[in-house]
Amino acid sequence: IEEDSFCMNQRAFPADLTYQVVIRLRTSTNGWLFGRVQKPDVVITSIPGGEKWDVTAAPVRIPQIWEFVPLTSMPKDFAEWKTKNWESAPSSGLFDKSTSPQTEVRIPNPLNTGGVDTAINWLNYWMPITGDKATAAPGVWSIRNLAPNEMNNSSSCYDSNNAQYKEKRVTGMVTSNAMITSAGPPQFDAKDQSLNYQVAGPHFEKDGKTLFRGTYDLIMRKDVARCLYGFTDAPIKASISIINANGEEIIATEQIAERNNASGEWITLGKYGFTFSSPRLRVKLTQEKVVAPAANPVQSNKSVMKSNKATITCIKGKISKKITGVNPKCPSGFRKK
């Protein structure tokens, strides 16, 4: 924030505000995006010589861990755990180098450098030591595109170069306020027909009492969903569930939010208010089967003629006869009864 008495002074984001960013790019952006925002609304339009981006979203608070713990307070298996789990991980050491001999352990964020499963392993080890709480939760508003090596061997449907798509463009975006998130876009599980995304973080805010509430947003072009699921052009329905480490569904305080942009090209979903430590977000897309209209009954070429025939009774003495015809007449010697 630039003011008369400050120069680029860093301030926290005010609560309950959204921010809009409009940018013009000389080249088209494509691929998958990752964001640290909430409830994003993205409009991308082609302009002469490039693209125009109009992005509106709210910032999110990302829990961080940065604790110094006396070595004497660490678990008895710390040395063994460190050898097995940390030596080949982040470059930053675990010990506070300002003391000699080293008497404190510096516990940093369990970043995703070793993959989400490794990071969750670190987090699960730290949480009982630090009280399962964040040291801080600074506000962040950021969106970036993922490099090819960050796509985590994801489906080719997320690739802008997929031959099914008419043009190269952004295929979608995933955002969350979790400390740890899956690499790349949600993974498609062909067996469950679901899009899965792993997140993790401490249960509590800095005070150790207030639950930290999670956010998750998924924006995806409809043609990407059709590519993943083999859908037709019929309408697509979506649902989000949150599964904890025990395989049980978590009830979020704010349920699924579906928002449609003006162009109708995007599927936009969100889930908010869930708690940690390591829930898995599961999105299921479904499509109603299109029922073919019943074939019209074949009309007979033969015209249906209405019957104009009549029946009369003719008698001759004790003999009677019934005569049927269009214009029936009694035979000679008979008279009409």
Show the residue positions of the predicted features.
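Mature, structured domains enriched in cysteine- and short glycine motifs
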Residues: 302-337
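Extended, non-transmembrane interaction/recognition domains
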Residues: 1-311
